[in-house]
Amino acid sequence: MSLEKMGQAAREAAYQLATISTAQKNWALAAIADELEARSSQILAANDKDIAAGREAGLSEAMLDRLLLNPARLAGIVADVRKVITLDDPVGAEIDCRVLENGLRLSRRRVPIGVIGVIYEARPNVTIDIASLCLKTGNASMLRGGRETFHSNLELVRVIQAALAASGLPAEAVQYIDNPDRALVGELLRLDRYVDMIIPRGGAGLHKMCKENSSIPVIIGGFGISHVFVDESADPVRSLAVIENAKVQRPSACNALDTLLVHKKIAASFLPQLVRLMNERQVTLVAAPNAMSLLAGADNLCEAGPEDFDTEWLGLTLGIKLVADVNEALAHMREHNAGHSDAILTNDLANAERFVNGAGSAAVYVNASTRFTDGGQFGLGAEVAVSTQMLHARGPMGLTELTSYKWVGLADYLICA
């Protein structure tokens, strides 16, 4: 099927989804969860093909981890779908309402956006996250995953479409672009007759390409250097636990720690403790010149190059730099592509407020790990993306962020004077 015909089918499906009840949506979501469980062996077999192809292509272990599905991860995906069922449906909810002097009852009511195009790399769970959230909000979706997860995504979409059809909904509500030709990405970005929003999920190059070539509004997000600043007053032992979690729990995640900024006054006592911990966790340290001498005990240490503090590591590598105070930490963050998730570890309330007000990130934390920037952690269910732009949506994009609104006026045969 051509992209044009896919767009037409998605638009027709979106019209139908916009009118169905929450109960119908939840019925279809339950069918998707059941079908994922029933066809788990086929899904895992498809994923095995992707992992084998990835190893043959020489992908890193961090990237292979992003691709991997196993029984536990698949069970987590199913649980996420069932979680979406329990969430409130924002469609139809009134944002606000007032009665004008002429008697017109005027309200803003949430509505689906329409057709969402999503271009993403790796992580096959994204396919289910997007489909389930779009379905709950009455949006159709057109998906283009990375070639690294081609077989996994194809099988997952087959499962979704079978469940939709069994629930009496159009299978075209979730469609997958299965042609690997990169030219189709450009064609999707210009399909503004049918597609209402583009969400790229991937690296800076993908976001730049979408922003420069799309005739459709683009949500920019997912990419950004995550920082943690250890202030002079921070509790060193508890800070190490937060740093370990932010860096090591899932280093391939976009909210994992990339750069650690340490106050100069505590560096001599704090960094040797950090080195021991990072050695245990086999983390490579990439240090600014002002930190090198204090990291001499590191098993894997190199001096930072010109672009290292602009690098989203997505693996067991950590940038380190010493700063004089919270203001210098914020200046470094502004210069080096902060915008996703950043944190300060401190017992100084004034510095905490200065950091929160000065950081331009979508999510800012005081004494907490950057790993919390996630739809599930925020209680939003799954997410379609983490937006790092100012307009429309910011941070994890859950159900509400996949809606727009319309004005609704109710009256008793009122005419305009």
Swiss-Prot record:
Gene3D superfamilies: Aldehyde Dehydrogenase, Chain A, domain 1, Aldehyde Dehydrogenase, Chain A, domain 2. GO terms for cellular component: cytoplasm. Its EC number is 1.2.1.41. Belongs to the gamma-glutamyl phosphate reductase family. PROSITE patterns: PROA. The gene is proA. Catalyzes the NADPH-dependent reduction of L-glutamate 5-phosphate into L-glutamate 5-semialdehyde and phosphate. The product spontaneously undergoes cyclization to form 1-pyrroline-5-carboxylate. PANTHER family: DELTA-1-PYRROLINE-5-CARBOXYLATE SYNTHASE (PTHR11063:SF8), GLUTAMATE SEMIALDEHYDE DEHYDROGENASE (PTHR11063). Pathway: Amino-acid biosynthesis; L-proline biosynthesis; L-glutamate 5-semialdehyde from L-glutamate: step 2/2. It is found in: Cytoplasm. The lineage of its organism: Bacteria, Pseudomonadati, Pseudomonadota, Gammaproteobacteria, Aeromonadales. Its main location: cytoplasm. This is Gamma-glutamyl phosphate reductase.
